[in-house]
Amino acid sequence: QRQMCIRDRPVLWCADKMTAYERRSFNQQRIAYVIPGKQLNAPLLGLLASRAVQSPYVLREAFSPSAQAVLLWCLLKKKHDSVDSTMIGEATGYSRITVNRIMGEIGMLLPELVSVHKGIKFIRIHEAKAAWMKARKFLESPVKRRYDVQRTVNWPEGLLVAGESALAATTALAEPGKFSWAVFAERYKILLKDECWREMAYAEQATDVIEVWSYDPVLLSSGRSVDPLSLMLSMRREAEMDPRVEAAIEHVEEELKW
């Protein structure tokens, strides 16, 4: 930062960038300032100018985890309903800024699902199956990592069944040797700190498998297992290598009640 000062002349503060707090403070103290190429604020000189720059959404090839969670929530629980940002925020706990970004992502990749009425954006899914089929190419596995763990006496209640264990519960797929459970990434850290399990270096020493998810599986679940859409996405890679898993996923999709 540098200050231009000439005796008996107005002072103009020049800075490459300024925070919102600094700009507000300068405005309150009536200090003239300029951010080259962006803003000029010198009311005593009769000079006020700014360049309005709207940051475009980054072109994405896939939804962010939060946007994916909201889209799946709409597909599973809000079919044929108009959902605005307030409803999304209340259901998910996401901030207004995050919800606005999510609306932008969905509107960019699936514009037919987003409409505007009186300045308010809504998500409305008329044909859930068609929306799912079109959205799949933008959706990713929610699983960030899988851990082989050994239970302790502090094993928590209420974990959602996931992975092959969830597939086996609703299809002809045989149950795996270890149960799989889904946990939101933020909760995983807490449960690990509470010594609910121990991470094992060798799979044969483990009693269970913990899937760490990029969004909260509880948001979308309506039972003891993770939701069917996230389940299919989480097992995509396994389905490519194992025809039994592929057949089980196809069965889950066929049984969906759109």
Each PLM stretch: what is its role?
Residues 2-6:
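Short, small-residue-biased leader/transition segments that mark boundaries at the very start
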Residues 9-30:
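Nucleic-acid nuclease catalytic cores
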Residues 30-42:
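Charged, structured surface patches that assemble and position nucleic-acid processing machinery
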Residues 45-69:
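Short alpha-helical segments that sit at the start of domains
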Residues 60-63, 118-144:
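Intrinsically disordered, low-complexity basic tails/linkers immediately adjacent to helix-turn-helix/homeobox/MYB/SANT
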Residues 67-131:
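Loop-centered beta-sheet repeat module
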Residues 138-213:
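Short gly/ser-rich loop at a beta-strand->alpha-helix junction or flexible surface loop bordering the NTP-binding
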Residues 196-258:
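Hydrophobic alpha-helical interaction segments
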